[in-house]
């Protein structure tokens, strides 16, 4: 239990209050606040916290907001450096918040006392600019990107041994405080059509296969990935076998295999095996899909991998390429 969300100001009082509720009802785990912007607090647990909820620590970010804009896409990163030395469980705070363009078809759903003036304003602006026919394209483009970011956000948390859980800001749009189109579902808890429940569940399930790999390769290097499984179900999985496949967009296998059976304990990240295969037979830029599945179950996950030729001949024609003005 938390005393509140993003509490600020008198932490001496909050600490005494936390001690009081612990004495009154010691059955639960308590924390002072679900994150805080208060100076001098919020980047490390308070003295009496049983667990810690935050966006960052004194060592760095623990959510993608401070990461994804500064590095190229890859699947082999986590937040271990930011949580090193943390002595209580850490939960990441209000992760996600990736905005999706308004679905203007939603306007007609408001038939009560609420009036979607924000959506109407966007629609009028598009109409003035002659872009009304692009609204669905904008929705899908931003929605697909948001879904990819949510996937990577959740998986990085799961890959980090020192992180015990995560909180999305919301799975659906929040209409109660300005415009917050942060959901993969709309304000009516309906799908926006940018992802499916089964797809989202691949990277957010009680048992989730995870991959540590680069996202971009050239044909002169081998594809490499470590496959692990996080088990947050209610029981140990005995003799779990992970099958994997690297395939092109038509489903044709570039390589595939499975790892030896092993136990997958509850509450742990279990390394199941490593994949290594050459890419030198690929002659043009390709999108590949790496998939990993716990055999005999519905638990599966997949990642898009991009492969480019190591060298590319360019027909320059009559164009002169030079770094000297006199030659130009």
Go through each PLM region and give its residues.
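Substrate-binding/catalytic cleft of secreted carbohydrate-active enzymes
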Residues: 1-173, 178-185
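Carbohydrate-binding surfaces of carbohydrate-active enzymes
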Residues: 110-328
């Amino acid at each position: 239990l938390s005393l509140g969300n993003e509490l600020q100001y008198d932490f001496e009082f909050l600490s005494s209050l936390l001690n009081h509720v612990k004495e009154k009802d010691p059955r639960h785990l308590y924390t002072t606040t679900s994150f805080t912007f208060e100076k001098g607090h919020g980047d490390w647990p308070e003295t009496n916290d049983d667990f810690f909820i935050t966006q960052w620590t004194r060592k760095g970010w623990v959510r993608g907001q401070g990461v994804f804009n500064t590095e190229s896409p890859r699947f082999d990163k986590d937040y271990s450096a930011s949580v090193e030395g943390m002595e209580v469980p850490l939960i990441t705070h209000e992760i996600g918040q990736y905005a999706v363009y308004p679905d203007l078809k939603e306007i007609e759903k408001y038939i009560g006392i609420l009036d979607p003036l924000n959506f109407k304003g966007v629609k009028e602006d598009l109409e003035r600019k002659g872009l009304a026919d692009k609204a669905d394209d904008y929705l899908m483009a931003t929605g697909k990107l948001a879904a990819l970011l949510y996937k990577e956000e959740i998986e990085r948390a799961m890959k980090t041994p020192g992180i015990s859980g995560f909180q999305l800001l919301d799975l659906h749009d929040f209409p109660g405080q300005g415009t917050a189109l942060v959901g993969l579902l709309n304000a009516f808890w309906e799908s926006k059509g940018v992802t499916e429940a089964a797809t989202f569940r691949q990277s957010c399930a009680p048992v989730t296969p995870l991959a540590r790999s680069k996202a971009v390769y050239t044909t002169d290097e081998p594809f490499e990935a470590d496959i692990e499984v996080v088990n947050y179900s209610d029981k140990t999985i005995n003799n779990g076998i992970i099958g994997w496949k690297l395939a092109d967009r038509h489903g044709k296998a570039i390589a595939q295999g499975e790892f030896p059976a092993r136990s997958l304990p509850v509450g742990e990240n279990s390394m199941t095996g490593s994949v290594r295969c050459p890419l030198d037979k690929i002659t043009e830029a390709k999108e590949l899909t790496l998939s990993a599945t716990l055999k005999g179950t519905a638990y599966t996950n997949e990642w898009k991998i991009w492969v480019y030729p190591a060298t590319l001949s360019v027909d320059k024609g009559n164009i002169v390429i030079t770094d000297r003005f006199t030659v130009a």
